[in-house]
Amino acid sequence: MRLLLVADVHDAAKTAERIPGNFDAVIAAGDFTYRRSLEAAVEVLEALARIAPVYFVPGNTDPPELASYENAAVKPVHGRVLPLGPYAVGGAGGSLPTPFNDLFRVAEEELERLLQRLTPTPQILVVHNPPRGVLDKVGGVRPVGSAAVRKYIEERQPAMSVHGHIHEDRGLDMLGGTIVVNPGPLKEGFYAEALLDGTKITVRLRRV
């Protein structure tokens, strides 16, 4: 299975049209629009769905009601788990409060509650907010990740965990046996590819 991993699209849906290759699904880790409306976020999701079916969580710049938007090709996994071929994908959207005018804020307790609802444990986790201490450095210095997300990954060990939010901390890391991915902001042309073959996962960072 070949997955396209994206985050922090911020209205740059046309960038996705330039991504080469075919994918079985798109895993999208939030922040689809700066325009502060459900219609704007849906417009971006529909553009991504022209590549492959989209499994997503909203980000802090997206309206909270996006978490329940769904159609045949666009599937929210905020607080729930859905099948994806032989795998399962689930997650949580929003972010811990920032100094900016967020639309979708969640406290640590809410993130923990959402993650504990994920049954069964998904092999593919998608959470806008990164785990504390992993791909979460603002300006390369200050960690702003979630302790609840880190705890969940450490305890449940999904095969892969996809995050966004911190544009400048794009990369790959490991948390126990979990591959942690920040594909980077699609707004700047960054994305990642994941190849899944049974329990083997290979992730490559790309740029359009």
For the regions a language model picked out, list residue spans one by one.
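Active-site neighborhood of phospho(di)ester-bond hydrolases with catalytic His/Asp-centered motifs
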Residues: L5-A7, V26-D31, V54-N60, P76-H78, ...
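Active-site environment of divalent metal-dependent phosphoester hydrolases
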Residues: H10-T15, T33-E39, P58-A67, P97-P99, ...
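Core catalytic region of metal-dependent phosphoesterases/phosphodiesterases
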Residues: V6-L84
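Beta-strand-turn-beta hairpins that frame and shape the catalytic cleft
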Residues: M1-L4, L82-G91, P120, I124, ...
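Short, charged, surface-exposed secondary-structure boundary motifs
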Residues: R35-E39, L84-V89, E154, G189-L196
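Conserved beta-sheet core of the metallophosphoesterase superfamily
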Residues: E46, Y55, V138-G198
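Active-site charged/polar residues at nucleotide-handling catalytic sites that mediate phosphoryl
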Residues: G21, P120, R156
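Conserved catalytic scaffold of divalent metal-dependent phosphoesterases
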Residues: D11-A12, Y34, D62-A148, R207
